């Protein structure tokens, strides 16, 4: 069931800067969504328009089928967890979580029960009397989430709320947030510039740049089938080469012809070819589809990150569990399904239509 709809939303500031350009999106109830993009892409502006903190210059915002474009933020069934958590330092954990219910003058017995339930949901049982300064960053974040969910919102907005945590704690909180969302069954909308966070937690990702949605889809679809150069580079590491479509399921790049899994592109058309570093296997020169010379190698714990130069001068990035020697000539092998062909200037709608056409012929 649709819970949030943005209909042709545009945001232009007084200085002429256009933060959002004709944004259309529909979000279903009970799912975890991520708005992913670099700084200035418009993701936080979308969040603020949904929350009611920022007015759109044009377009409509719908909540549960009702037009809330001009509805005050305090009257929306939407709560927000901010980047800095916005906890009250002079109040303890219980008082922070209970704050909204006390403002509404709810009975003390109800407040105690709801605070207890909220703290249990975020795994902070026994922390009610702790002072905020006594908590770790991850614990403070969970207090902020408990405070946000105590009003039982239908939608929870999270604005870059993992960015202040160290790497280990960020990874832990990814599991925590996903578990909390599944337990509550409400819609989470998570803003981040970190593609790993978005891939790990989301049911669906919206990739933004320059005020536009460049692609939307499941984490697997976004990663495996980027529609353009920006998405391919922003979502994970990529080798992106210039190529030419030979015919359906055949493409030329790096001076050779290869089988691929793409079709529906005009023969002879210039394209871009994406190969992910983890899809490249290092083998002997005789067994490889291409020959490369190793330039550098970094050991990153679970794999080696290898940079190598192809015979055409292209610099390849390869992820391998096996190390190699600097200066060594090796072969790289990949399957047709590892090759992703991108049409120059193709929109997401055009890509989806092309995909349906040639998949329907199978």
Swiss-Prot record:
UniProt xrefs under InterPro entries: AAA+_ATPase, ABC_SmlMolc_Importer, ABC_transporter-like_ATP-bd, ABC_transporter-like_CS, Mo/tungstate-bd_C_term_dom, P-loop_NTPase, PotA-like, PotA_ATP-bd
Binding site for ATP: 37-44
Cellular localisation: Cell membrane
Similarity comment: Belongs to the ABC transporter superfamily. Spermidine/putrescine importer (TC 3.A.1.11.1) family.
Subunit structure: The complex is composed of two ATP-binding proteins (PotA), two transmembrane proteins (PotB and PotC) and a solute-binding protein (PotD).
Protein purpose: Part of the ABC transporter complex PotABCD involved in spermidine/putrescine import. Responsible for energy coupling to the transport system.
UniProt-recorded name of the protein: Spermidine/putrescine import ATP-binding protein PotA
Organism of provenance: Lactobacillus delbrueckii subsp. bulgaricus (strain ATCC BAA-365 / Lb-18)
């Amino acid at each position: 069931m649709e819970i949030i709809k943005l209909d042709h939303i545009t945001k232009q500031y007084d200085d002429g800067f256009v933060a959002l350009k004709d944004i259309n999106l529909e979000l279903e109830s009970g799912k975890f969504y991520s708005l992913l993009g670099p700084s200035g892409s418009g993701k936080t502006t979308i969040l603020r328009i949904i929350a009611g903190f920022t007015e759109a210059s044009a377009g409509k915002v719908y909540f549960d089928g009702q037009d809330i474009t001009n509805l005050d933020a305090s009257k929306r069934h939407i709560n927000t967890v901010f980047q800095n958590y916005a906890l009250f330092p002079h109040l303890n954990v219980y008082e922070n979580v209970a704050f909204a219910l006390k403002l509404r003058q709810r009975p003390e017995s109800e407040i105690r029960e709801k605070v207890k339930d909220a703290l249990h949901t975020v795994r902070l049982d026994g922390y009610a009397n702790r002072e905020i300064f006594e908590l770790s960053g991850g614990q403070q974040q969970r207090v902020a989430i408990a405070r946000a969910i105590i009003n039982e919102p239908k939608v929870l907005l999270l604005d870059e709320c993992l960015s202040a945590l160290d790497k280990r704690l960020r990874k832990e909180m990814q599991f925590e947030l996903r578990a909390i969302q599944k337990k509550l069954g409400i819609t989470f909308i998570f803003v981040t510039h970190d593609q790993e966070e978005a891939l790990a937690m989301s049911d669906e990702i919206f990739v933004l740049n320059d005020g536009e949605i460049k692609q939307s889809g499941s984490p697997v679809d976004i990663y495996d089938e980027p529609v353009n150069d920006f998405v391919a580079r922003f979502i994970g590491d990529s080798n992106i080469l210039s190529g030419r479509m030979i015919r359906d399921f055949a493409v030329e790049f790096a001076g050779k012809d290869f089988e691929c899994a793409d079709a529906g592109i005009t023969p002879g058309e210039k394209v871009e070819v994406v190969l992910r570093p983890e899809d490249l296997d290092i083998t002997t020169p005789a067994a490889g589809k291409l020959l490369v010379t190793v330039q550098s190698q970094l050991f990153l714990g679970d794999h080696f990150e290898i940079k190598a130069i192809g015979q055409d001068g292209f610099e390849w990035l390869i992820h391998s569990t096996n190390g190699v020697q600097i200066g060594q000539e090796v072969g790289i092998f990949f399957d047709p399904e590892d090759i992703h062909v991108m049409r120059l200037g193709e929109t997401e709608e055009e890509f989806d239509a092309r995909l349906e056409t040639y998949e329907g012929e199978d």
